[in-house]
Amino acid sequence: MGSTDGKIAIYPGTFDPLTNGHASLIQRGCQIFDHIVVAVANDTPKTPLFTIDERVQMAQEALEGVGSITVEPFSGLLVDYAERRGAGVILRGLRAVSDFEYEFQLALMNRKMKRHIQTVFLMTDYKWLYISSTIIKAAASLGGDIKGLVPDNVYRRLREKYGYPYPLNG
């Protein structure tokens, strides 16, 4: 068993892209934990729109000035990564009951592999319950208005990626 500090939390995800829901959860997590490592997953069964470097950069820019955080890529098993980083907690967000079953299974598997690493769930702020990176990308790909659902830098990158001009002041 490795040495871990329960005051350091890992918040993992693909963040393809980071949404205001993610940012809100990280801000709230900063009120609970001394430090949060925003761990951007490199190994994902999904086909990301943005490269790992783009996702890390967008998250770093969007979260600048938000508490004590580090944004970095990770590969491999999450619990192994958490242990290497000295984190005693994996932070996860829940939007709906449908999220819970999957997240509960992951938490149990992680606990089986590394009993000393806990999973803590935070409910998503009600303003962001309906958004996900997948829904954001679907709307943006069709020119939908996603302003206010993602950080400004992410908004610009999505508009550029899909070839739509973005309003500078709207």
From Swiss-Prot:
Annotated substrate binding lies at T14, K46, L78, R92
What is this enzyme's EC? Answer: 2.7.7.3
Q: Which cofactor does it need?
A: Mg(2+)
Q: Which GO terms describe its biological process?
A: coenzyme A biosynthetic process
Its annotated pathway?
Cofactor biosynthesis; coenzyme A biosynthesis; CoA from (R)-pantothenate: step 4/5
The signal peptide, as residue positions, is none
Q: Does the keyword Cytoplasm apply?
A: yes
Site entry (Transition state stabilizer), positions: H22
Alphabetically ordered keywords of this record: ATP-binding, Coenzyme A biosynthesis, Cytoplasm, Magnesium, Nucleotide-binding, Nucleotidyltransferase, Transferase
List of residues binding ATP: T14, F15, H22, G93, L94, R95, E103, W128, L129, Y130, I131, S132, S133, T134
Where would you find this protein in the cell? Cytoplasm
Query: Which GO terms of the molecular function aspect are on file?
Result: ATP binding; pantetheine-phosphate adenylyltransferase activity
Quaternary context: Homohexamer.
Record family assignment: Belongs to the bacterial CoaD family.
Q: Which HAMAP family does the annotation name?
A: PPAT_bact
**Protein name (Swiss-Prot/TrEMBL):** Phosphopantetheine adenylyltransferase
**Lineage start:** Bacteria, Pseudomonadati, Thermodesulfobacteriota, Desulfovibrionia, Desulfovibrionales
